[in-house]
UniProtKB/Swiss-Prot annotation:
It comes from Streptococcus pneumoniae serotype 4 (strain ATCC BAA-334 / TIGR4). This is Homoserine O-acetyltransferase. One of its GO terms (molecular function) is homoserine O-acetyltransferase activity. The keyword Cell cycle does not apply. The keyword RNA-binding does not apply. Its main location: cytoplasm. Substrate binds at residues 163, 192, 249. NCBIfam families: metA. The lineage of its organism: Bacteria, Bacillati, Bacillota, Bacilli, Lactobacillales. Transfers an acetyl group from acetyl-CoA to L-homoserine, forming acetyl-L-homoserine. Belongs to the MetA family. It is found in: Cytoplasm. The record marks 111 as: Important for acyl-CoA specificity. GO terms for cellular component: cytoplasm. It is an enzyme of class 2 (transferase).
Length: 314
């Protein structure tokens, strides 16, 4: 799928070397179709890495997407230059009068904090409330999923005894579900987190469907029945070496991390790590764009505000 982004974005050159179709405004203007508007709230510290990971997967279906990046104005990034943020990102006040067909909320390295102690929490809360009437389908990832469940349903996150890090199997639970079209009965994906949610709380506090789970990871992906909200606790978007970089970063910082499970051959960190989830990732993101966004979003964006949804409320 062609994605329309600022041609100066550093990710563009990387994507073009991978034969991924990106277009600028001039070329996009000659396509006589309405593009889908996708907003990405990027809360990850390595902004450019996450941009490339997500754009790589969003460029996987034959639909034109207009991508906007959003950042929390109440938080100052320590790892990405302010020039990059000012050039390629928008603030919430700049987008709050717009409508979007889809939104992705990434993870964030703030699991150790209570939600209310995150410095951008109030801004995040306002943005999530706004999304109910201005975004058709929202895909929450990792901490973004935990935060969304907490704000909307009061589902808590719980500290795990040790970090969950590695490539883990999950079973698909709803045969024929649109988000898992083309999937086998089971698949693997990266997980990297210190906290988890309670399946019992999800069942007792929400009307969300649990779509996949695994023995090590617990609940992995759940969604409202109308696919207006989707929660994924893994990282299908990760590159081959993302978990390795996290491991070496933590090791060099003196944290004595566990070697990511099912990742390095024979647990030898000098080996090239496996890549065994890319086809599942491609399918998942394509299914989200095609079935949750493209086939359901109204042609007139303003009707999103009038399109009432029960979401996952009981």
């Amino acid at each position: 799928m062609p994605i329309r982004i600022d041609k100066k974005l550093p990710a563009v050159e990387i994507l073009r070397t991978e034969n991924i179709f990106v277009m600028d405004d001039q070329r996009a203007a000659h396509q006589d179709i309405r593009p889908l508007k996708i907003l990405i709230l990027n809360l990850m510290p390595q902004k450019m890495v996450t941009e490339t990971q997500l754009l790589r997967h969003l460029a996987n279906t034959p639909l034109q997407l207009d991508i906007d990046f959003l950042y929390m104005e109440s938080h100052r990034s320590k790892t990405t230059r302010s020039e990059h943020m000012e050039t390629f990102y928008k603030t919430f006040p700049e987008v709050k009068d717009e409508y979007f067909d889809g939104m992705i909320i990434t993870g964030a390295p703030v699991e150790h904090l209570p939600f209310e102690e995150v410095d951008y929490w109030e801004e995040f809360r306002q943005m999530l409330e706004w999304s109910k009437t201005h975004v058709y389908s929202t895909l929450h990832i990792c901490w973004g999923a935990q935060a969304g469940l907490y704000l909307r349903y009061g589902v808590e996150k719980y500290q795990m005894d040790s970090k969950l890090s590695g490539i883990y199997p999950q079973d698909t639970l709803k045969e024929g579900h649109l988000l898992f079209r083309g999937f086998d009965d089971s698949y693997v994906s990266p997980h990297s987190r210190h906290t988890e949610i309670s399946k019992e709380e999800v069942l007792n506090k929400t009307n969300l469907e649990i779509l996949s789970e695994g023995p090590q990871v617990g609940v992995s992906i759940l969604a409202s029945r109308d696919l207006r909200e989707i929660y994924s606790f893994g990282h299908l978007e990760y590159d081959r070496d993302t978990l390795a970089k996290e491991y070496f970063r933590d090791r060099d910082a003196g944290f004595d991390p566990h070697i990511p499970e099912n990742y390095f051959k024979d647990d030898d960190v000098n080996q090239v790590p496996c890549l065994c989830w890319s086809s599942s990732a491609a399918l998942f993101f394509s299914n989200w764009v095609d079935h949750a966004v493209y086939q359901e979003t109204p042609f007139d964006w303003r009707k999103i505000e009038d399109d009432a949804s029960a979401y996952g409320y009981l």
